[in-house]
Amino acid sequence: MSRKPFIAGNWKMNKNPEEAKAFVEAVASKLPSSDLVEAGIAAPALDLTTVLAVAKGSNLKVAAQNCYFENAGAFTGETSPQVLKEIGTDYVVIGHSERRDYFHETDEDINKKAKAIFANGMLPIICCGESLETYEAGKAAEFVGAQVSAALAGLTAEQVAASVIAYEPIWAIGTGKSASQDDAQKMCKVVRDVVAADFGQEVADKVRVQYGGSVKPENVASYMACPDVDGALVGGASLEAESFLALLDFVK
């Protein structure tokens, strides 16, 4: 099964609309063919309309970094998945470790968000990953497997096949430490095996699994060479146009 690689940059809480506009203008015409690789940027909510407007007609996919699981109502400070779709958003990142840690998001919240994203015609990038303590205790596979199963519960096989799952070991995010090629392959295969157990091998063969955690232009090719790594969710190295383009210049 040939899965199209997907490299997505997560800007986190960086860039104002002017900076976002300059970035997209710098990369839009230089992106590789969408037949070869999918390129995306997860922009802060206040940058989304700018990024979507400048990216229009290019190969750049646009993701939100979060949404709520209701479309409207008395939910002060939340972002509506319905409105994200209306403005043209393609993907929504959910379950990032920073959201789980700082904002106390649960597996149940993430599952509800996944359902809301599909209900509104977008696709989720579902993040999972273990702490250093869990990793060193040898419980990474068990922990991540439970996160994946919980996030996908109640989705249809078709929805799961269209999902993107990003494995990001928490101990490698923004720390300069990165998982070895073997670790990345092993854990991305764990993700795929959990999908196979829950939804069947055919679905597991279609779902795209990204690795995230200190991915840079210098190491992206080694991760992309892994049979179960279908892309990367990249933080710091996606903030500069030149670096983002270099991430896309790998040979699978």
Swiss-Prot record:
Pathway(s) it belongs to: Carbohydrate biosynthesis; gluconeogenesis; Carbohydrate degradation; glycolysis; D-glyceraldehyde 3-phosphate from glycerone phosphate: step 1/1
Keywords: Cytoplasm, Gluconeogenesis, Glycolysis, Isomerase
Compartments where located: Cytoplasm
Disulfide-linked positions: none
UniProt keyword Plastid present: no
EC class of the enzyme, as a word: isomerase
An example Gene Ontology CC term for this record: cytosol
A single BP term in Gene Ontology: glyceraldehyde-3-phosphate biosynthetic process
Annotated SUPFAM superfamilies: Triosephosphate isomerase (TIM)
Similarity section: Belongs to the triosephosphate isomerase family.
Record note on quaternary structure: Homodimer.
Name this polypeptide is given: Triosephosphate isomerase
Gene that this sequence comes from: tpiA
